[in-house]
């Protein structure tokens, strides 16, 4: 059954227009390879930030706001009590002590949410609750703890000064104050502040709807029995989780076998709900690498060899009538994940309007000597450590195989070994991409 009522037949597919034209790709180097930075910048140049729209504040956590927000009210909205106690005129109790307490009549009570009396007469007090409006002419609050908690009369044992335990109108936020600047990422505390000033909706760039598809006839969903020639589909789970971690709304479609017609139909069906499609596998030079063979039929595509390890084969395209971006990653799990961090995460950040599009890395000293391949940027798995002074070092974990998911799980960083080096001495400062920092 095709998604959302789209026709599922070859005739429908034959009439998908190739409306997209990709910009001129970067020229490869003498070795025929594109640098990691060239490919990343090319992808970022090919995609646009999503159009903003108004969303309820509770749905905006982590999103980029597209308008300045100015408070229309004061916070607090009125002078209110910071304590449970008694509203007083400070002059009436300025000389109160434990040895010579002051006793005053209680003439009323002001609960939180109640209206404040117009004024407090000299020589009287009113019970007042935390957050309740302060009566007119009262200029201090005496906490219960400094009294005998009387109901008709109260004994005050400590002096008060004007303004004590009173939260003044507008002392936190004044009407007209800039609360959030356009381009800011909305955090947990921002949601609370927006609600406090009465804002229920703000203009934000939405979470991109990302569809994840893995390819390969050998793949089986976790939980099912395996035949000897089969493996579990880890890629779609890994990349779907990474996309969700990057802030996207994710649809994991699962896997499709090495069937060109089935892949073409599946991708076409997903265009109705996708801001970005990610595939894994099928972008190399093998006889069954169907992604590279089929996807050009749905739009404009670019396949490149990138001077990086792992993750050399890469693909990108704009497909369908809406020029939906599709990023085609290699099939080995570590290659797919490293490629996601290098290329897909920056694209998702741009779609969301999250700047900088490329997250800054850390600088860490190499904990030991490391070797690399000249001409390729190595993105090796590593573990970051810090000593008691806060100085950070990084050591490599596991081997170089692009299938070693166990080593990837143990790593908390990707270590960037530059393309112009073959050997890194211990203590050399390196760029490191942390994997477990807030996104």
How should each PLM-predicted stretch be described?
Residues 1-37, 200-329, 333-339:
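Helix-rich terminal scaffold detector
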Residues 1-97, 355-381:
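Short, low-complexity N-terminal leaders and the immediately following helix N-cap/first helix
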Residues 13-37, 86-257, 393, 398, ...:
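Short, glycine/charged-enriched hinge/interface segments at domain edges or termini
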Residues 32, 36-40, 53, 57, ...:
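Generic structural signal for well-ordered, non-membrane alpha-helical segments
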Residues 41-52, 66, 70, 171, ...:
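Generic secondary-structure signature for well-ordered alpha-helical cores
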Residues 43, 85, 176, 212, ...:
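Residue-level signal for inorganic ion chemistry
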Residues 57-58, 67, 113, 173, ...:
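Flexible glycine/proline-rich
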Residues 81, 121, 142, 272, ...:
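Structured loop/turn residues at beta-strand edges in well-structured enzyme cores
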């Amino acid at each position: 059954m095709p998604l959302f009522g789209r026709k599922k037949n070859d005739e429908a597919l034959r009439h998908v227009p190739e409306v997209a034209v990709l910009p001129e790709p970067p020229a490869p180097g003498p070795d025929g390879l594109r640098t990691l930075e060239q490919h990343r910048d090319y992808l970022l140049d090919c995609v646009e930030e999503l159009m903003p729209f108004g969303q309820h504040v509770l749905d905006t956590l982590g999103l980029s706001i597209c308008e300045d927000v100015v408070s229309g009210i004061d916070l607090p909205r009125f002078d209110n009590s910071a304590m449970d106690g008694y509203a007083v005129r400070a002059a009436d109790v300025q000389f109160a002590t434990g040895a010579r307490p002051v006793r005053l009549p209680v003439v009323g009570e002001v609960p939180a949410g109640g209206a404040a009396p117009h004024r407090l007469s000299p020589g009287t007090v009113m019970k007042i609750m935390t957050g309740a409006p302060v009566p007119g002419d009262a200029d201090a609050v005496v906490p219960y703890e400094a009294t005998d908690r009387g109901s008709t009369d109260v004994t005050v044992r400590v002096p008060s000064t004007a303004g004590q335990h009173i939260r003044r109108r507008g002392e936190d936020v004044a009407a007209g104050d800039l609360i959030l600047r356009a381009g800011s990422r909305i955090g947990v505390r921002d949601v609370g502040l927006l609600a406090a000033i009465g804002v229920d909706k703000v203009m934000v760039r939405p979470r991109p709807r990302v569809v994840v598809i893995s390819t390969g006839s050998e793949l089986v969903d976790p939980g099912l029995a395996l035949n000897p020639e089969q493996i579990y589909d880890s890629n779609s789970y890994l990349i779907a989780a990474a996309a969700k971690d990057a802030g996207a709304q994710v649809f994991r479609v699962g896997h499709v076998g090495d069937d060109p017609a089935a892949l073409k139909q599946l991708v076409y069906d997903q265009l109705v709900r996708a801001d970005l499609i990610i595939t894994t596998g099928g972008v190399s030079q093998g006889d069954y690498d169907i992604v590279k063979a089929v996807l050009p039929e749905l739009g404009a595509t670019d396949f490149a060899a990138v001077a990086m390890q792992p993750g050399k084969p890469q693909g990108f395209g704009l497909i369908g009538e809406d020029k939906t971006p599709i990023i085609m990653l290699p099939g080995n799990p570590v290659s797919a994940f490293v490629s996601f961090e290098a290329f897909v995460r920056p694209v998702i950040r741009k779609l969301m309007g999250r700047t900088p599009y490329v997250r800054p890395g850390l600088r860490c000293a190499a904990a030991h000597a490391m070797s690399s391949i000249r001409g390729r940027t190595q993105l090796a798995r590593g573990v970051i450590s810090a000593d008691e002074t806060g100085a950070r070092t990084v050591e490599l974990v596991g081997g170089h195989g692009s299938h070693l998911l166990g080593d990837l799980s143990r790593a908390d960083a990707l270590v960037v070994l530059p393309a112009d080096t073959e050997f890194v001495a211990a203590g050399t400062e390196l760029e490191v991409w942390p994997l477990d920092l807030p996104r």
